[in-house]
Amino acid sequence: MANLTGTIKGLYPETLSPEQLEKLRGFKIQTRITNEKYLRTHKEVELLISGFFREMFLKRPDNIPEFAADYFTDPRLPNKIHMQLIKEKKAA
């Protein structure tokens, strides 16, 4: 693969002007805020991630990438998440 180090301006923060660095910093902060708001309003994401980690820690697979691929492509997963959402709404 070709070495792209330093060939495209902007890949490295040290090549940015102070104004560009400030804009980049603001963009990163805004992106984090937006992501946090999304995660807080979409309970299904929390259920997906916590379910994955729970299963991974219980089963302790040797090949984690393969386990993750199998977990997230399980055709039953959407229904499991839907049922958990319903269960949590009833409990609230």
From Swiss-Prot:
Residues 43-77 form the RIIa domain. Coiled coil: none annotated. Signal peptide: none annotated. Disulfide bonds: none annotated. It comes from the Eukaryota. PANTHER family: RIIA DOMAIN-CONTAINING PROTEIN 1. This is RIIa domain-containing protein 1. The gene is RIIAD1.
